[in-house]
Regions:
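Membrane-integral, polyisoprenol-dependent glycosyltransferases
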Residues: 2-7, 15-396, 571-579
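Membrane-embedded architecture of ER/inner-membrane glycosylation machinery
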Residues: 4-7, 17-25, 32-33, 215, ...
Length: 589
């Protein structure tokens, strides 16, 4: 894909201030990591097995133990729960409020998992959040494997494995796999579509594939496109469409598009996506398109929504954290990519990356995960340059490998500091994991010039996996203060009531509705007082700033109630400390 000279030589090791013993031990560890890659490149089955194992190591921590996360995850999960409860699989609602911002794809996937678990007798399936996360986990793992598959159109198997490892250890994907919403699954569909489109594009000037391969490639492309549309509407069309337009304009030819069987493909796309769109139009009229296109899509393009505005350059700045550890090599790979920009493979990957990135930087509403579908292109570009041994050797760029050490150290300080300040605990289980991550990051940086980029990247991947295990497997689940809804629902379950009911004032996050039940009333102080007056086993969760008003309303109505525990917590959706008082009704007045 690119050509160049080795990025370093063993002679550079003499400049490093490390002992011979330490170097030998580090190189032995590096050889062990390299042996794993050597094993993986032996066959496609081995490569898939290694990537699957690494992905599971990075993606499973916290998957089962972290409570519902406000707000998006809880909103998606609650809407799915209502589908299962009501048997209504066309209309999308959060309590009585319609949710027409996104199509139905993710809700159907989550509902399928939850209904299957319920049918198998899984207890409390409707309120078990990790069941709703399974599609995201599958999407994230599939995205890693599909990155490997897509990369094989451009680079060697070894480089494709490295690209997959970069995605498996990527910070942003490591977060999205944990959240029960659309983005990990969307990434999967984009990588599948772009991998198929790459093969169609790169067939130009080569021996044509047999008819079976051509039709299979086209089927993958159009099926992935349809799935992406059902998951998140036009975003996948933007990524694929802008890439295709860029290639057509640069090459002044669109002949390769015929390899994707566009006529049959469009018919297949319509067969897959139109039934639900017609059903929702029949149910809601033009309300769905008014909210999803007019309110959500155009609203995000033309104005910042929900305080998520940021200037152009936002994604570029975040990239160095959200694509860590792979991002550390991006600057070193850029000169080689630029030199090879006219090669078909590089041209395609840049068309995948650049146009959509520029559009997203210009859109007013910005969220970190919007650029996730573009990260596989970056991973493949970097992996190709590593494989060609063409990374830049300019000292000021090489010094950037310090970032491999900085991130795990910063994560250690932040994570253990949060345990001490918020959780008031030492978090001893996290210390060896974070320490190991810092050591691997240090060695990745310090021995980069001695051992080369591949060894450095593999050490950094190990650092990323250890960091993920510590942060998501130990630290975050220990911070119960970040998840007050789980604490409040625990109070309900321990109340001795068979069917407790709840109302909430002030603190009204979606996770409370998901865990406490769809009938949970989100109201004001008067509504809470009237709610308690309605019978026994009723609970009111009142944020401290509303407590005086509630007491006055309850007294005026003659409501009899008892005071329960008070909860000091942090509202994770806005980062603010909150205190919630619990009140329980005493019969009807």
């Amino acid at each position: 894909m690119v050509s160049g000279q080795p990025e370093s030589t063993p002679d550079r090791a003499r400049d490093m201030v490390v002992t011979v013993d330490n170097k030998e031990r580090s190189r032995a560890a590096a050889r062990s990591l390299k042996t794993i890659v050597d094993f993986a490149v032996g066959s496609h089955a081995r490569a898939v097995a290694v990537l699957l194992a690494v992905a599971l190591l990075g993606f499973l921590p916290g998957f089962f133990s972290i409570p519902p996360i406000d707000r998006d995850e809880a909103r998606f999960a609650q809407a799915t729960k209502q589908m299962v409860e009501s048997g209504e699989y066309v209309d999308i609602r959060f309590q009585d409020e319609v949710r027409y911002k996104k199509p139905v794809g993710i809700y159907w996937l989550q509902a399928g998992v939850v209904k299957t678990a319920s049918a198998l007798g899984f207890p409390h399936a409707l309120t078990t959040i990790w069941l709703y996360r399974i599609p995201s986990l599958i999407g994230a793992i599939a995205a890693v494997l599909l990155t490997y598959w897509a990369a094989l159109a451009f680079v060697s198997r070894r480089a494709a494995v490295l690209a997959g490892l970069m995605m498996a250890s990527c910070v942003l994907l490591g977060v999205e796999r944990l959240i029960a919403k659309t983005d990990a699954m969307l990434l999967m569909t984009v990588v599948a579509a772009m991998g198929a489109m790459a093969r169609a594009y790169l067939w130009q000037g080569r021996e044509r594939p047999d008819a079976s391969s051509a039709w299979t490639t086209a089927a993958v492309f159009w099926t992935a496109l349809a799935a992406g549309v059902l998951l998140k509407g036009p975003l996948i069309v933007m990524v694929v469409g802008l890439a295709a337009i860029a290639l057509i304009v640069v090459d002044r030819s669109a002949s390769w598009v015929l390899s994707l069987k566009p006529l049959a493909g469009i018919v297949w796309l319509a067969i897959l996506v139109l039934p639900w769109f017609l059903a929702i139009i029949g149910r809601a009229g033009d309300a769905f398109f008014a909210e999803s296109v007019g309110g959500d899509l155009f609203g995000k393009v033309l104005a910042s929504q929900e305080s998520h505005g940021a200037p152009p350059g936002y994604y570029f700045i975040l990239f160095w954290v959200t694509f860590w550890p792979g991002a550390t090599l991006a600057a070193l790979a850029t000169p080689a990519v630029w030199r090879a920009r006219h090669e078909p493979a590089i041209k395609f990957l840049l068309a995948w990356l650049v146009p959509s990135w520029l559009v997203l930087e210009l859109v007013m509403t910005k969220l970190p995960h919007y650029v996730l579908p573009l990260y596989p292109a970056i991973a493949i570009l970097i992996a190709g340059v590593i494989d060609a041994r063409a990374l830049s050797r300019k000292p000021f760029l090489v010094r950037g490998t310090l970032w491999w050490f900085v991130v795990p150290v910063a994560a250690s300080v932040a994570g253990i500091g949060a345990l001490a300040v918020i959780g008031r605990q030492f978090g001893l289980l996290a210390w060896p994991l974070m320490g190991g991550a810092a050591v691997m990051g240090f060695l990745a940086w310090r021995l980069y010039q001695a051992d080369g980029a591949e060894h450095g990247l593999l050490r950094a991947v190990a650092a990323a996996i250890l960091t993920a295990i510590a942060m998501f497997g130990v630290i975050v689940p220990s911070l119960g203060q970040l998840f007050p809804s789980a604490t409040l629902v625990r109070i309900l379950r321990e109340s001795g009531c068979a069917h407790p009911q709840a109302a909430a004032v002030g603190y009204q996050e979606p996770s409370l509705v998901f865990l406490a039940g769809t009938p949970t009333r989100l109201t004001d102080t008067l509504g809470a007082a009237e709610f308690l007056r309605g019978g026994e086993c009723r609970f009111a969760f009142i944020e401290a700033r509303e407590e005086r008003s509630f007491a006055q309303r309850a007294e005026a109505l003659g409501v009899r109630y008892s005071a329960g525990p008070r909860i000091d917590a942090i509202n994770i959706s806005n980062g603010r400390p909150i205190t919630i008082a619990v009140f329980r009704s005493i019969g009807s007045s």
